[in-house]
Amino acid sequence: MDISNFILGVPDFPKKGVLFYDITPLMLNPDAYAQAIDEMAEKIAQANPAKILAAESRGFFFGPMIALKLKLPFVPVRKKNKLPRKTVCVEYALEYGTDLLCIHEDAVSPGDRIAVVDDILATGGTAEAMCKMGEIAGAAVSYTHLRAHETLRHLV
């Protein structure tokens, strides 16, 4: 099955000049969604990561399922003040400013190999921030599905 048939391009959303990729049709089809998870998990497994990181909210559509499929820990990456314990945070650029992404301080250990999962790529800022967070904690980035993007080439 061609998964791209379940991802719809929506022009000028959320603003003029932006092509938004709507993945809800993919998630409405259990067979297509399962295939997408299986294909991503297969690629990520080749990098032999110890943990999967994904950012809220749309990264949570894929990251936890991939982690379960590979029997790996899932590290939720949240915005500032959303995690209850001590955190490691990294500032990242948005189209309209900056924000902070955080993980619990003990979520990633020195020497861990991490895989970074996100749903889409706009500027690459979210994925880059997740990679930097892992590196601050002493981990090595072993996989990001966005590896072809110029912003991230130096991280993998």
Predicted regions and their residues:
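Active-site-facing substrate-recognition patch
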Residues: M1-N48
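Short glycine-rich phosphate-binding loop at a beta-alpha junction
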Residues: P49-E56
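Short Gly/Thr/Asp-enriched flexible loops that form oxyanion-binding sites at enzyme active sites
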Residues: F61-L70
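Short, glycine/charge-rich flexible loops or terminal/linker lids adjacent to PRPP-binding catalytic cores
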Residues: L72-I114
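Conserved G/P- and acidic residue-centered "switch" motifs that form tight phosphate/ATP-binding loops
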Residues: D119, G124
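Active-site/ligand-binding-proximal alpha/beta "capping" segment
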Residues: G125-I136
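Conserved small/polar residues in nucleotide/adenosyl-binding loops
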Residues: T144-T151
